[in-house]
Amino acid sequence: YATVPGFNNNFVAGANYFVVQDPSVTAGLRQAKLGELILLTIPQDSLKYAGWGSIKPIPKNYVLDLNEIANIQSATMTFNNYIEQQAIAHNLAYVDMNSFLKTIQKGIVFNGVTYSPTFVTGGAFSLDGVHLTPRGYALAANEMIRTINAHYKSTIPMIDVNKYNGIL
């Protein structure tokens, strides 16, 4: 890439960030930045065999840049705040699933089994990296049950998460 006009070569010996398309820079490509995300929908064969990310930049539609991530986070916060306000206004139980999913990042133990966001082996998220596994949905259901029980002073029993299928 040293011969590509406008490309700032920041490569070092060892691991480097992927090379991604970026129409906003002169060269039209750059190294990915810390905090940017490569989508799991990227064709794996293109990474392995077509040189995407190393000798060819990863197409923009497979990359979430820092601005896009900030926009997503802002929209998520706006939607969640609206939902919470409506629940409060109508005296309904409100489950903050965004906060709950953030607790999974730290790991949740249920009856001796730890669930985390670790891809494939964490047990909470499916192989698409977005949706929960049946066990992950059972964890979410338990969070809903806890909230309903607290708000309405009910006694709905918790689900045994470990009885549901996981990935492994």
Say what each PLM segment does.
Residues N81-N91, V95, K106, N142-K153:
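Sec-exported extracytoplasmic/periplasmic mature domains
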Residues Y62, A89-V95, F125-L132:
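Short, exposed beta-strand "edge-strand" segments with a Pro/Gly-rich flavor and a Y/T-containing core
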Residues Y1-A89, F100-V120:
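Acidic, Ser/Thr/Gly/Pro-rich low-complexity segments that form flexible
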Residues T118-I167:
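Histidine-centered active-site loop/cap adjacent to the catalytic His
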Residues D96-S99, G136:
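Active-site proximal loops enriched in glycine and acidic residues that flank catalytic Cys/His/Asp
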